Amino acid sequence: MAVKVEPGTVLVMNTHYVNASSEPIEADARINLYSLPAEKVKTEAGMLFYYNPFIRVPENGEASARMRCIVQDDISLVRVQSHMHRRGVGFAAFLGDSAGANQQEIYTTTEWERVPAKAFSPMLQIKAGQTLDYRCDYKNPEARTVTQGQSAKDEMCMLIGPYFPRNAALENCANDKGEHTGTWIGSGTATCGETLGCVVGAKSNDVFYGCIVDSCPGSATAVSDVLLCQMSDGHGACQASCPGADCESCVIQACGTQISACQAAKCQ
């Protein structure tokens, strides 16, 4: 079993460091990679790399980020771990049915720095149609709002784990067309209609992220469906118009079903 790396692929080892002392520190990170002939690989493995971009933690406040992904194929999960930055105070991941119900906790931690990886023995068998649902909890001691991003000044919410056999699409919570299929689950009280109005009026990414965080859990499917339709230019129907003057009207028409469902959705 191995992970295949195609010719020309760039491998990036991304590490984060926070120096809380008054003196410089020397950072060091190393990794060992081992290769074997392609003809000896019987099964190709992959890496789940779920990333939830909808994070907004108010100044001196608390917040959560939650996302649910459908696993499209039968897979074996080797191990799993979280990734958050220093405001992360809790993480939990669950395996559930296609509706996200009947959940079984598969991983939990309160660590953001020395993150434990949970190895499954025997490996965790996940059936096609089951879901992985994970949540990151944050506590922000700073006098500024913190949102998602790549630096230590920002936050992240990720579920990571090697698995097999590989399906490149499901690694990023996407379908075979490359479209994200996850469900973003807010922790607020806003209905889908209110959330959509917030998104349309958002003038910055910070506000946009907050719109989703503030949505109610009961509207999660409707919120995610309309967002995914809009962000994919009407699931590709408006590619010829976007970007352009006719993009907005095309997307509104192409996403009419999702918009109507959103306006009708209630918090339950």
Regions found by a protein language model. Name each.
Residues 1-76, 81-185:
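Beta-strand-centric surfaces of beta-sandwich/beta-rich domains
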